[in-house]
Amino acid sequence: MVMKKILIIILFTLLSTNSYGVEKKTNFTKEIFNKAKSEGKTIVINSYEEWCYTCTKQVKVLNEAEAKFTDIVFLSYEQSKHEDIGKLLNIEFWTTIVVYKGDEEKSRLIGVAKKKDIFNAILKGI
């Protein structure tokens, strides 16, 4: 009986942790970023952590945006594993979304996960 309870606890822990995991991978490189800037493209950068609930919500919205805005460059990176990128972009916190149009930063959100707010921030860069 004790073993059964332990297995249930382990299973519950694994399932609940997995449901918050971010299914996003780092695709940010300086080369891609600099090329998109020099071409005057709209760029959306997302800083996340795999375990972060808000990040998971943001990723879902950003995936929708990426499907809708096919001419925008979407870049992401895991903050704790790529602090150099955070320093380059002056991003201190995960859950940060920054929108550029070429060289110019057009909007910055921290901790915002509502679709309307994220889409409005992206539209400022178009």
Kindly give the residue locations of the regions a language model identified.
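Sec-dependent N-terminal signal peptides
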Residues: 6-15
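Sec/Tat signal peptide C-region and signal peptidase I cleavage site
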Residues: 17-23
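A short beta-strand-turn-helix
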Residues: 25-41
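Short active-site neighborhood of thiol/selenol oxidoreductases, capturing the structured segment around
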Residues: 38-50
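Thiol-based oxidoreductase modules, predominantly thioredoxin-like and allied folds used
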Residues: 47, 71-84
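Typically the conserved alpha-helix immediately C-terminal to a functionally engaged Cys/Sec
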Residues: 56-68
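Structural micro-motif
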Residues: 89-98
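Non-catalytic, surface beta->alpha helical segment in thiol-disulfide oxidoreductase systems
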Residues: 101-126
